[in-house]
Amino acid sequence: MALAARSAAKLEALQQRLAREHGLEGEPEGLGFGTLVADTSDPASLRAMAATTRVLLSFVGPHSRWGMPVAEACFAEGAHLCDITGEAKYQKLIIDKFHDELTQKGQCFVTACGYDSVPMDLATFLAVKELERMGEAPRAVVLGVGAAKGGVSGGTIASGIHALSDKEISRFTHPHVLADAGDAAGPPRKEPPKAPVVFFQRGFERWGHRGWLGPSIMESVNSKVIYRSASLPWMRPLYGDLEYREGTLFASRLKAWAAAAALGLAAAVFWAVPHLLLRLGAFPRPGEGPSKELRDTGFFNHHLVAESADEDKYATVHVQGSRGDPGYKTTAAMAVECAACLAMEKDSLPGAGGGVLTPASCFGAAVVDYLARAGVTFDVRAGGPGEGAAAPGAAAAAAEAVRA
């Protein structure tokens, strides 16, 4: 294992700091990590880096700006690639450029391996697998964003501003923009219905929620990833013509509408003058972010309801992260575990044939045990309203079903 960055001096300083924090300062082996110096402006350095590894995990962003040289180097050297981006333009570009040839080589590029969109993508997969176990086909999945604590990074803000400044951004807003074209034998991909701003969904009462949902700012990112999962050939029989919706859980319709109004106002201001807000210090700059205390004490709790085609039964999933800020500490841990799963189990994974993949389409439930080491767990339950005790080991059972 090795850490890579542009600056050898900063890499050395990082190694020393991590050794101190983990009580390994002065140990002959230190952290046990090597270091590599590579720069996106130097393609030869990127290829040399990619040539040394089976799986490269990229945290460089905005990916629309810096990601393509890394992807090109990995493609050329045969390395698998994982990233944490939610940038649809970059994801679409690498799909169009690499997907078909990656499938011929059995090489995997797995995108969205962070908070967006591992919890949502895997929860959707586990829910539709549970419906399949019940003998039901899925009609719709609704993800309810619950209690969470975390901050926002300067890099995330920079990616958002970079996207807003892109005159081509409107080409990448459709929910199915990342979906695989498939073949004529597959189910049709119908246009997702326009979701209301505030809506009610049954099934959340199982988790103590009243079922009122308002807007979720990351639905546009997560929906594209999930629709790509649903569209890939080995996933289409399971997902069918699935509809995905996402919202933030609220105690009442009134609170959901109040939050929707506040979010709409904030989005309008950000859309109008993002660069001014950044200069005024309203947001962290690239390289800045939450305090260590917030990174260490953050968490998330989300719930998902998957309805059967006849709307008579449903499966629910509670996905939670308990070991840190979702967008920082937990994202880093999830991405590392995804990369580890790919490195250790590639040949037995659902996505072993390669391509530009999502977490669910590449790993299936095989990554669930890896994510548990990052403090991210999935509680799968089944039944109708008021039914459904916890299904012990449901996620593990799904993993075995996938492998079988």
Predicted regions and their residues:
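ADP-ribose/adenylate-binding Rossmann-like module
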Residues: 58, 62, 71-91
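A short helix-to-beta-strand connector/capping loop
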Residues: 20-36, 105-107
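Rossmann-fold NAD(P)-binding glycine/threonine-rich loop
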Residues: 67, 85-107
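C-terminal catalytic/substrate-binding lobe primarily of soluble NAD(P)-dependent oxidoreductases
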Residues: 106, 129-404
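Structural motif
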Residues: 54-55, 80, 315
